[in-house]
Amino acid sequence: MKGKLLSFTLFGESHGKAVGILIEGLPPGIEVKVEEMKAELERRKGIRRFSTKRRESDEPVIVSGVFNGFTTGTPVTVLVWNRDADSSYYEEIRNTPRPGHADYPAKVKFFGYNDYRGGGHFSGRLTVGVVIAGYFAKKLLERFGIRVRAYIRRIGPVECPQVEPEELFASPNPYCPDEDAFERMLEEMEKARKSGDSVGGTVEVVAINVPAGLGGPWDEDIEADLASALFRIPAVKGVEFGLGFRFAEMRGSEANDPFVVRNGRVATETNNHGGVLGGITTGMPLVARVAFKPTPSIYLPQRTVDLERMDEVELRLRGRFDSCIVPKALPVVEAMVAFVLADHLLRRKAWEGVVR
Amino acid sequence: MKGKLLSFTLFGESHGKAVGILIEGLPPGIEVKVEEMKAELERRKGIRRFSTKRRESDEPVIVSGVFNGFTTGTPVTVLVWNRDADSSYYEEIRNTPRPGHADYPAKVKFFGYNDYRGGGHFSGRLTVGVVIAGYFAKKLLERFGIRVRAYIRRIGPVECPQVEPEELFASPNPYCPDEDAFERMLEEMEKARKSGDSVGGTVEVVAINVPAGLGGPWDEDIEADLASALFRIPAVKGVEFGLGFRFAEMRGSEANDPFVVRNGRVATETNNHGGVLGGITTGMPLVARVAFKPTPSIYLPQRTVDLERMDEVELRLRGRFDSCIVPKALPVVEAMVAFVLADHLLRRKAWEGVVR
Amino acid sequence: MKGKLLSFTLFGESHGKAVGILIEGLPPGIEVKVEEMKAELERRKGIRRFSTKRRESDEPVIVSGVFNGFTTGTPVTVLVWNRDADSSYYEEIRNTPRPGHADYPAKVKFFGYNDYRGGGHFSGRLTVGVVIAGYFAKKLLERFGIRVRAYIRRIGPVECPQVEPEELFASPNPYCPDEDAFERMLEEMEKARKSGDSVGGTVEVVAINVPAGLGGPWDEDIEADLASALFRIPAVKGVEFGLGFRFAEMRGSEANDPFVVRNGRVATETNNHGGVLGGITTGMPLVARVAFKPTPSIYLPQRTVDLERMDEVELRLRGRFDSCIVPKALPVVEAMVAFVLADHLLRRKAWEGVVR
Amino acid sequence: MKGKLLSFTLFGESHGKAVGILIEGLPPGIEVKVEEMKAELERRKGIRRFSTKRRESDEPVIVSGVFNGFTTGTPVTVLVWNRDADSSYYEEIRNTPRPGHADYPAKVKFFGYNDYRGGGHFSGRLTVGVVIAGYFAKKLLERFGIRVRAYIRRIGPVECPQVEPEELFASPNPYCPDEDAFERMLEEMEKARKSGDSVGGTVEVVAINVPAGLGGPWDEDIEADLASALFRIPAVKGVEFGLGFRFAEMRGSEANDPFVVRNGRVATETNNHGGVLGGITTGMPLVARVAFKPTPSIYLPQRTVDLERMDEVELRLRGRFDSCIVPKALPVVEAMVAFVLADHLLRRKAWEGVVR
């Protein structure tokens, strides 16, 4: 994720020495508490029952950029050693790309040199770094009262009813503010798990107290930057803001949010627009939804091609798979949104500092 | 749109001297025919009946980067003078931001210095430059047989049934390959127009003959780059690839596309994934859908705030508005997709040139 | 010149329709006076006697990004139409690259598609755009009291003695604060002119009131960014800061500038370091020197190769050449320095806005 | 160093856990031999007698991006753990910035949060990462026969006579191809060392077999990109190409290099231009010179300011300092040049792959 003033680069492979992140542009003076960072990483493990059995402690090692408990302003590098990787299995399926996975296009892209073990650099394990980036970004946003929270909006056929931002931020349930919907989501995931299958879902992410004026037209469009960040998360196949695709079915008179005065400030009566108009934040809550496809690794037999012999074969995967990755995606989605917001906030401060 | 090797910057304002584009990174030797470029620009005007009455000839003036009918390899600048702008009206509504428009957040973003006339730099008129960028990108892609085409997938409640890529590229109808659906779309737009309202829709864009291996994980993700480009188009509120949001309702066993051998090459039996896995093209047709909200400018009365007096007022817009911008968005969507593909193709060629 | 928050792109060819510039990232609210801009452009014409006889009015046409006399915050495009170009001559020398010019490598780089007339995109005429960029950057810097001024430090064997910043900024002579040296420089240029030759020189540029803290180590190094900008000016072959190459001959004990307290602030007693330590400004005047090679276009006969026949031939140039480009380089050097400083100042403001 | 297709970011602090590098854009299939990499790192230690007594084994740990002995095409991270750091001393001088060092401006830049121990992120130790980047870049260049070599051109008053590229590449002396000059350089460094002082110098770097056509005008200028990279090396205060600053004293008729035919190819008779004209390589050897100031850390007493009490004090440094860093700069200079060349080579291949 390369912002103008804030960017990060993920490194590492699922079965290599480590995974990690290098963050550039973090301002100095952000307080860093490893326990807090670990708590965020813990969220990334999702609901144990529906997650891969690979369970590592994910101990973040801060290699650079933090001194005496605060960011220094120079590049921050954090890595997490890999410990519990079992690569033996991947040699078996090296020539039989898994449907729905990057195996085949990656082989083409990297001329066969890529580390194919456990998905290599494509592995969901790389999101460890994303969550760490989010940790720093959230700390920066907190200074301005900006908060970001994601919840599961859908698992397969089960959709959570629309919730108001206040409800969401007040909810004690870390996955979904609607307990009833959450129960049914769990059932859906369980059904998928039991049948050796997987299931998709959507995540809704909300950011509050975002000031108006972040973003801009064309190259500065904050929706475009957010979408760009969110699509980089593995398995994401759709992103929408506000009413998103539902706008396509509407008339302008229904879709437009009237401007009103609330507590002496400009606001909109409804928030169909999801907090962004013309690529710029309006001061209303930012609302986006992200579609995740079902994990492609499933236990059911699938058809694929043996790339050496160029014939079609049946593939039966063994290993430790998530039956649903949506619960573990929550902190990852939040991290991407927080990071983009932090970049745009910094850009805003640059202008505020010179426009008189 | 800033790619790694290919980027463009739009400039101009709706009621300023001109709108235009500067393109960097175009390789030398692309043949440029102004008539072809104009034909593309003509498509951008959409269906006359449902488009703004502002009708300009959109004569592209190539200012730099083209010599003897070919690109030179240095920055290409093309501009189109504005002629038919009527700004008188905009002074009236200067302090009453139009609902659904960028007026209010733009005023915050630009500290009140933005050119508010006709939407200024936010105007749909700026897409003139996008279409010009697309013209060059398509010419480059053509050398490799890559073709990009967009069609209207939905207008309000009317959805075009799924079409196969071959059908689409063979269709004589420039808006929608399904004549029956198109008829009903026209009716829908007419209804909106007559009631002084506007209507939204979706565009589906397909690219064929895209080689496998473009894109990459994380920072090189081609879906992210495409989404980033598409969200920069005004009024876009959602982007999805392949089955997109429908993936969220599915099981992995339904969603995964089996790999097969077709004509001695690796392909997938179905194309749920829309041509990209793990951020990398698979060689299958690239398929994306883009949601457009209804044009916010409507003739029906709306509520807004007078920013000077900070009280709520009724707003009745006069002017020349599109009742539906979806038809004119087609070449814009194609242009964005073509441009991103061209950037990734160039990056691919860099690696092909050094990996031995 | 691509900075993080401020960048510009030059476009146009010497004998094409126009030359111009697109500037991105300029904050809104910078007052623009065309007469001031023209005065800067006038400086770029140098001393009439030693400059090309091509004399155009260089009327800047502001195409975008300025509204009601102030920058809007969106991309600023300014162009200057070409009027007095005589291309007939260039067909003659198309296959015989001029020694010291980009003709030959440009032909290779652009696969023969480049506009070779008058140097095309390589022409010194493109510095029109640089000067315009400098105009905006200087206006921004002025708000913070930062001023940039360049003077001729050397023409051939004649060197101006070191001057103090105060002297320089107070000098009425626009080329060199030392009248005696300037007289001898003029003689040197005249001698070169009369013999159908050209002569090189150096420019020293000084910026005062630059706050401490701009720049940073490695990727943020402001000397590197300044050098990068300065080397983009045609004919520049060397850049140095402070004592520059003289440091190589020195001992640390001579070279180090002692820190002292001046008016209650930290300063250095001497300014050998030229205002930058470790890539960061110290608050002392920024001092850089730039070496310009003699204009390669001379009237004396030269040897070159006929690229078609691949044999060696004599080349006698006709045309209108500068006998010395150093005088006209002054506003160009200032512009590059001002632009880089403005970019770093913006970045600084971003951090100042969030570090608490 | 951020190129268009190839970039690296250094991380770490002198007395932190580690120093290292993350490289993005390296193509897959580059063979990696740790012993070769260590040999390059060994060169970075310079001549033992004149280098800091901190002697670490500099064992590179390849964390990511290399699989089965070849680059994978995903980000390469290499780190070297810090072992022999003694930080106790730095608390003493925390408030008394060392003359010639970044201590003072760094404190301003980072609002006091920077790791000041051993220079922190400004430490020469960070060049470990640069050398590693150079290792990869050189391997890529080797495929095309491109070789880069640097030598000491000057130490204080002692200058090595000009050498031809063939001589340089054939020389067995790793520091200077002229044995006599090298002897005198050693004496000069010894004199500085004995007097508790340090001495500056210049490095000349030469690249051979660079194809014509790399680089371009303005934003693509390869001299600008090289200078930008070279100025990022600590202590560099000047960069010049070909005759560099000597051009300023010359006439065009002396300076211009006649084009000639050599072995059926276009060449120049002389190489005053140093292999680049108009920002583009000409096919002649690339020649640049880099000025290094004397190491600011010396044992002689110096004057500085106590930043807390704001009064002037005498500073006597203790610690382990280089009396001359020029010998250890050689692989660092080579690395920067190789890296920039590799980036431009990749860009060239992109165009070669599409221009027909």
UniProtKB/Swiss-Prot annotation, chains A, B, C, D:
One of its GO terms (cellular component) is cytosol. FMN binds at residues 121-123, 278, 293-297, 320. Reduced FMN (FMNH(2)). One of its GO terms (biological process) is chorismate biosynthetic process. InterPro entries: Chorismate_synth, Chorismate_synth_AroC_sf, Chorismate_synthase_CS. It comes from the Archaea. CDD domains: Chorismate_synthase. NADP(+) binds at residues 44, 49. Keywords: Amino-acid biosynthesis, Aromatic amino acid biosynthesis, FAD, Flavoprotein, FMN, Lyase, NADP. GO terms for molecular function: chorismate synthase activity; FMN binding. It catalyses: 5-O-(1-carboxyvinyl)-3-phosphoshikimate = chorismate + phosphate. PROSITE patterns: CHORISMATE_SYNTHASE_1, CHORISMATE_SYNTHASE_2, CHORISMATE_SYNTHASE_3. HAMAP family: Chorismate_synth. This is Chorismate synthase. The lineage of its organism: Archaea, Methanobacteriati, Methanobacteriota, Thermococci, Thermococcales. The gene is aroC.
